[in-house]
Amino acid sequence: MSHSVKIYDTCIGCTQCVRACPTDVLEMVPWDGCKASQIASAPRTEDCVGCKRCESACPTDFLSVRVYLGSETTRSMGLAY
């Protein structure tokens, strides 16, 4: 089951989400848009288990990394209407 992982440009390049991910879905890549000159990237979304630890680890006011669970997972968790 794949989930969608979206990285927003509010990322400050702190690496907290990368370190929190238990399945190494995330990695840092060079980016000139922030002070740290790097941004999180999600090249291996097929390995995402939907735990959302990356979201919990993100220190920005607007979460810079979001995990959107696949519809099958949403239904099985009782979150769908």
Curated annotation (Swiss-Prot):
Residues involved in [4Fe-4S] cluster 1 binding: C11, C14, C17, C58
Root EC class: oxidoreductase
Cofactor: [4Fe-4S] cluster
Membrane topology designation: Peripheral membrane protein
Pfam families membership: Fer4_7
Reactions mediated catalytically: reduced [plastocyanin] + hnu + oxidized [2Fe-2S]-[ferredoxin] = oxidized [plastocyanin] + reduced [2Fe-2S]-[ferredoxin]
Cellular component, GO annotation: chloroplast thylakoid membrane; photosystem I
GO biological process terms held by the UniProt record: photosynthetic electron transport in photosystem I
Subcellular location: Plastid, Chloroplast thylakoid membrane
Molecular function GO terms recorded: 4 iron, 4 sulfur cluster binding; electron transfer activity; metal ion binding; oxidoreductase activity
4Fe-4S ferredoxin-type domain residues: 2-31, 39-68
Binding residue positions for [4Fe-4S] cluster 2: C21, C48, C51, C54
Keyword annotations from UniProtKB, A to Z: 4Fe-4S, Chloroplast, Electron transport, Iron, Iron-sulfur, Membrane, Metal-binding, Oxidoreductase, Photosynthesis, Photosystem I, Plastid, Repeat, Thylakoid, Transport
Cofactor comment: Binds 2 [4Fe-4S] clusters. Cluster 2 is most probably the spectroscopically characterized electron acceptor FA and cluster 1 is most probably FB.
Enzyme Commission number(s) from the entry: 1.97.1.12
Known function: Apoprotein for the two 4Fe-4S centers FA and FB of photosystem I (PSI); essential for photochemical activity. FB is the terminal electron acceptor of PSI, donating electrons to ferredoxin. The C-terminus interacts with PsaA/B/D and helps assemble the protein into the PSI complex. Required for binding of PsaD and PsaE to PSI. PSI is a plastocyanin/cytochrome c6-ferredoxin oxidoreductase, converting photonic excitation into a charge separation, which transfers an electron from the donor P700 chlorophyll pair to the spectroscopically characterized acceptors A0, A1, FX, FA and FB in turn.
Assembly mode: The eukaryotic PSI reaction center is composed of at least 11 subunits.
Protein name: Photosystem I iron-sulfur center
Gene: psaC
